Amino acid sequence: MKTTDKVLIGIVIGIVLLIVVALIVTLAQPEPAYQTEDTPEGVTYNYLLALQREEYERAYGYLSPTIKGYPASAEKFIEHIHVYSWNFRLDTDTTLSVESVKISGSNATVTVRESRFRGGDLFDSSQSTMVFDTELHLEDSEWKIIYSHYYFASCWVREKGCK
């Protein structure tokens, strides 16, 4: 066997090994799990995870009923998610992580980092990252979401709600 053939075989074996390792690492990652609901960051994380898993009734339970335009039912909440889908950003592959929490009395602000991935060619990951805030209020010893810059219908904060 020629030296160039051995080098080529070595390169091919190396590439195959890299692909196998990448697959193992990807498949071995655990599924995200719900967190405890006694902290603002836990409630925010659970709300976003429930939306990603399309467990809309659970996500609805994290909203504060004191929101001016609070959806009257889980069915209305689901309808709003579909009507205002651009603000819920559920059509792309996203990773969400809690960055920080600021608590002031019965109010809290949770800062969330969103990384969005779009399909591209081999050398273009098309990844974008942004940070947004979610506002919570402590009601009857439970943290409830009262506003979020994303994953929230802005009409919920209006007196008349969504139409």
Regions found by a protein language model. Give the residues of each.
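Intrinsic-disorder-associated interaction segments
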Residues: 1, 70, 94, 125, ...
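Short, low-complexity N-terminal intrinsically disordered segments enriched in polar/charged residues
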Residues: 2-53, 61
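Alpha-helix initiation/capping motif
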Residues: 2-4, 55, 66, 89, ...
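Mixed-charge, polar/low-complexity N-terminal
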Residues: 24, 30-32, 36-38, 42-43, ...
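Soluble non-cytosolic domains of exported or imported proteins
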Residues: 34, 38, 42, 50-57, ...
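Short solvent-exposed beta->alpha transition segments
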Residues: 46, 57-118
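Broad hydrophobic/π-residue packing in well-ordered secondary structure
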Residues: 47-51, 60, 76, 134-138, ...
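Exposed beta-sheet edge and beta->alpha loop/turn motif
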Residues: 100-163
